[in-house]
Regions:
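Short coil/loop linkers at secondary-structure junctions
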Residues: 44, 107-108, 129, 149
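Alpha-helix N-cap/helix-start motif at coil-to-helix transitions, marked by capping-box chemistry
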Residues: 63, 113, 133-137
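Conserved non-catalytic scaffold segment of RNase H-like nuclease domains
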Residues: 1-90, 98, 144, 154
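Acidic, Mg2+-coordinating catalytic module of metal-dependent nucleases/exonucleases
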Residues: 84-91, 95-96, 100-101, 132-181
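A short alpha->loop->secondary-structure connector
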Residues: 102-113
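Short alpha-helix plus adjacent loop in nuclease-associated cores
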Residues: 116-133
């Protein structure tokens, strides 16, 4: 599958404020696209196929988008192995991103290293450690548990923001535990 939306957040640091950016890609193939799934995310097949003016303005070729993403991500001045990817079920995202860079013959400029943090696995570990494994760990479940609002579930932009808030609450929990030691 080709990603249609890629949304990233750069966490705030001493040198830069927090920033989020979302890119829209025209898929390489339209074979496996389900129209019903597009509607959930607010996309239209005719836009993806560039049959509309709006679609031609919004959805760009992966080769163009990758350069924009690389430039935006590397503004932090870090090397790829110093940067980490945080996500919910992050291996899915990391594999899809790496495959996208591979299809564009650009793996050598992939802006992330191997460091990943997964909100789903963090939550599973917390529950497992307390002997209370939940039946599931969907982002929807975690936003509810932590009181996080996801204004438009299943859109990359909103899911990324919600995941970040869940991650910050998980991180705050660990900070409190570690401060007691």
């Amino acid at each position: 599958h080709s990603p249609i939306e890629i949304s990233l957040i750069r966490f705030a640091s001493e040198n830069s404020p927090e920033e989020q950016k979302t890119w829209f890609l025209q898929p390489a193939s339209f074979e496996n696209i389900e129209v019903a799934a597009l509607k959930v995310n607010g996309h239209k097949l005719e836009d993806l196929k560039h049959q509309t003016e709006e679609g031609r303005k919004k959805y760009h070729k992966p080769s163009e988008v990758l350069v924009e993403i690389e430039n935006w991500v590397t503004e932090d001045g870090l090397l790829g192995d110093q940067r980490y990817l945080v996500g919910h079920n992050v291996n899915f995202d990391a594999n899809m991103l790496q495959y996208l860079w591979h299809t564009q013959e650009s793996l050598d400029s992939y802006p992330f290293g191997r460091r990943v943090l997964d909100t789903m696995m963090i939550e599973f570990f917390l529950d497992w450690s307390a002997d209370k494994v939940a039946p599931g760990y969907r982002l929807q479940d975690l936003t509810k548990k932590y009181g996080v609002t996801n204004s438009k579930a299943h859109s990359a932009d909103a899911d990324t923001r919600a995941m970040k808030e869940v991650f910050e609450k998980q991180r705050d929990f660990f900070k409190k535990v570690l401060a007691k030691q």
